[in-house]
Regions:
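Class II aminoacyl-tRNA synthetase-like tRNA-binding/catalytic domains
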Residues: 172-221, 371-483, 487, 545-546, ...
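His/Asp/Glu-rich mid-to-C-terminal helical/loop segments that flank catalytic regions of hydrolases
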Residues: 264-282, 454-459, 463-466, 646-652
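RNA/tRNA-interacting regions in translation and RNA-turnover enzymes
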Residues: 1-389, 493, 516, 563, ...
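Short amphipathic beta-strand starts and helix->beta connectors
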Residues: 28-36, 97-102, 213-214, 289-291, ...
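Long, charge-dense accessory insertions within large macromolecular proteins
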Residues: 154-158, 175-176, 181-182, 450-456, ...
């Protein structure tokens, strides 16, 4: 996530003489990546990419806190200024507007604070606030809304304001949404609420807030507002993230809440907001401060061994320097004479620091990754042949392109209906925990459903398409899914023999010859269900299955589904030179009457193995129970005589009759 902050705003919290260029360079070296430092009039604007695990840096103050530690490591004095709140959080003496708050599940909202202001004057914010918001990428609206956005950028604490008079019954109930509920948000969008979304309803049951994401239109602050309810809180990050994913909608506030907001910083932000309301809105505090904080987090302690620090960093770093680095970052240390120490984590890092390695990462980045030695760790080098997958992918794609195929690229996710169309059980597939929509719920276990969907949208004769991509196979609850790279093609308007020829030619292109085509017998599998029972086959090479091809049951569409990883393992780049034969071949066609359930592959194999003189066997015609094979005879040492060919022919006829009960057609 990228944020934009002004140099002048940063220096309100950081006392230093470092230049903007130095700040950008050293912050990038030891903490967050500064993408750009841009001169804007008499100021500088930083564009900073904040890593997901560091929500404490999603604010001006958080970055100032980081820089106060980092800059002195480069010889640049820096000091973090204390957060001063001139007006402490207090309650009014006379006026006390009522507000009833009920939180149905404390885990939804770990900390809830609220206060009401009266006699609010709605007007534009001071110029400096407007400029800082606009240059940080947030539109200035009015003094009330701008306060919440301003403090979100400055302190990293999102907050929300309501028109108090629009909250019916002066009552707020924070709960999870139920099925079928909707809210009209501040952007005038009607949003159906997924089950389990955190919401707030008022005394009449109207939903007035899509918590952590955007407020409701029915409680917004407008130019007529006189009483404002300020609401500063934290939420369960997981619930906010899930809601954003299901709604396909995310705001600046949600981007912070879903990463985790420090509940200990809520009162600081509330105090700062109360001060700004009195100053910028001429408002009076008109209620008691509500602070619901039932389960404050327990103090987090992590054991750290200095020997482990040195082992992982690969250098000897003194105990004194380790202590100095960690204390400068806000950690509290309990040390003794041994190498062990107990480290108490500061509240703003509770979600980030859990194990000794987290602390070592902190030590390493402040010490300076650029100062660590670049020696490679000792290891045994094992020589192995690495398969060049991109090369073979390019080779296969080029071959298919020249044969008239078009490559398709489909989503890896499919819907339940697409799976059921090809008789794949959804419960046997990998379900995505947080799908983007109902159309993308499962990771596909095969490329076939995707290609069939493409074919249904492209109704035409002689369609030839293919896809080379991963499929994901569910194993068991205790095993990781299996990920396979598959090559799948779809052909319409052709014959079984031609599709078989494509598969054989493709494998020959990769140096895989003498494959065995066997009937596919597994009826209960996915392939057994979608393919025609007598027009499907399995490709075997060296006792390994390379894939399946066949005709679909319901229409004249052929599919081949090949295990690309296994194919590449069997590829052979070595091409043997074969001299052009000196002696001519003899070619003849033999027609046979074939009994039912006799496979052509068996016949061709029987013919080919009859004699070494037989160089090639092809099926050239098929009609009812008759098959015609073209047999090529050739001797590399002499010209064959008719008598020699006749002898081999008779041997073929006898062998087929004895083994397969096949008769020569008269």
């Amino acid at each position: 996530m990228n944020i934009f902050i002004l140099d002048s705003w940063l220096r309100e919290h950081l006392q230093t003489k470092a230049t903007p260029k130095q700040i950008g360079e050293y912050l990038s070296l030891c903490s967050q990546s500064v993408e750009k430092v841009t001169k804007i009039e008499d100021d500088w604007l930083y564009e900073i990419e904040i890593t997901t695990n560091r929500p404490d840096c999603l604010s001006v103050y958080g970055l100032a806190r980081e820089l106060a530690v980092i800059l002195p490591r480069f010889g640049l004095p820096a000091k973090l200024k204390s957060l001063e709140i001139s007006q402490p959080v207090k309650t009014p003496d006379k006026k006390n507007l009522p507000l009833e708050v009920k939180i149905k599940d404390a885990s939804l909202c770990p900390r809830f604070t609220a206060v009401i202001f009266d006699k609010v004057v709605i007007k534009p914010s001071p110029k400096i606030i407007q400029e800082r918001l606009e240059k940080s990428g947030i539109r200035a609206l009015n003094n009330v809304v701008d306060i919440s956005n301003y403090l979100m950028l400055e302190l990293g604490q999102p907050m929300h304001t309501f028109d108090y008079d629009k909250i019916k019954g002066a009552k707020m109930i924070l709960r999870e949404s139920a099925g079928g509920e909707k809210i009209t948000t501040l952007d005038d969008q009607i949003r159906p609420l997924p089950d389990g979304t955190i919401i707030i309803e008022d005394g009449e049951g109207r939903i007035i807030d899509l918590c952590g994401i955007m407020g409701g239109k029915n409680s917004e602050v407008d130019e007529k507002t006189k009483k404002v309810l300020l609401f500063v809180q934290t939420y369960d990050p997981v619930r906010i993230r899930q809601a954003c994913q299901k709604l396909a909608f995310r705001t600046e506030a949600a981007s912070r809440f879903e990463k985790g907001v420090d509940p200990e910083g809520v009162l600081i932000a509330m105090g700062k907001a109360m001060e700004m309301f009195e100053k910028n809105c001429e408002a009076e505090i008109a209620s008691q401060l509500i602070d619901i904080y039932p389960n404050p987090p327990q103090e987090k302690k992590v054991k750290l061994d200095i020997n482990l620090v040195n082992k992982i960093m690969g250098i000897e770093i003194s105990k004194k320097e380790i202590v100095n680095i960690l204390e400068s970052l806000g950690f509290v240390l309990e040390t003794n004479q041994s190498s062990l120490m107990t480290v108490t984590v500061p509240h703003w890092r509770y979600d980030d620091i859990s194990i000794p390695e987290d602390l070592i990462e902190e030590i390493a980045r402040i010490y300076g990754y650029h100062r660590l030695p670049t020696n490679l760790p000792p290891m045994a080098v094992v020589s192995q042949n690495k398969i060049d997958f991109p090369k073979w992918e390019a080779k296969i794609k080029t071959a298919l392109k020249f044969w008239g195929f078009t490559e398709t690229v489909n989503y890896s996710m499919v819907s339940e209906s697409i799976l059921k169309n090809v008789e794949i059980k959804p419960e046997e597939c990998l379900r995505i925990a947080n799908p983007l929509s109902d159309e993308w719920v499962f990771l596909r276990p095969s490329l076939v459903p995707s290609l069939l969907q493409v074919a249904s949208l492209n109704k035409k004769e002689n369609l030839k398409i293919f896809e080379l991509a991963n499929v994901y196979l569910f194993q068991s609850e205790n095993q990781l899914p299996e990920e396979n790279l598959m090559l799948t093609g779809l052909v319409s308007g052709e014959s079984f023999a031609k599709v078989k020829g494509v598969v054989e030619s493709l494998l020959e292109e990769l140096g895989i010859k003498e494959i065995e085509i066997k009937p596919y017998q597994l009826q209960k599998t996915f392939y057994g269900k979608i393919f025609h029972p007598s027009r499907r086959a399995e490709i075997i090479f060296k006792n390994n299955s390379l894939g399946i091809f066949g005709q679909l049951k319901k229409e004249k569409v052929f599919v081949f589904d090949l295990d690309f990883t296994q194919i590449v393992k069997d590829t052979n780049e070595i091409k043997k030179y074969q001299a052009i034969p000196k002696y001519p071949p003899i070619i003849e066609d033999l027609s046979f009457v074939i009994p039912e359930k006799t496979y052509v592959g068996e016949i061709m194999k029987a013919i080919k193995t009859t004699s070494l003189i037989i160089q090639r066997v092809e099926l050239i015609d098929s009609f009812e129970d008759s098959r015609t094979f073209r047999v090529t005879y050739q001797d590399t040492k002499k010209t064959l005589t008719d008598e020699e060919v006749e002898k081999i022919r008779n041997k073929i006829i006898k062998g087929l009759k004895d083994k397969l009960k096949i008769q020569l057609k008269s």
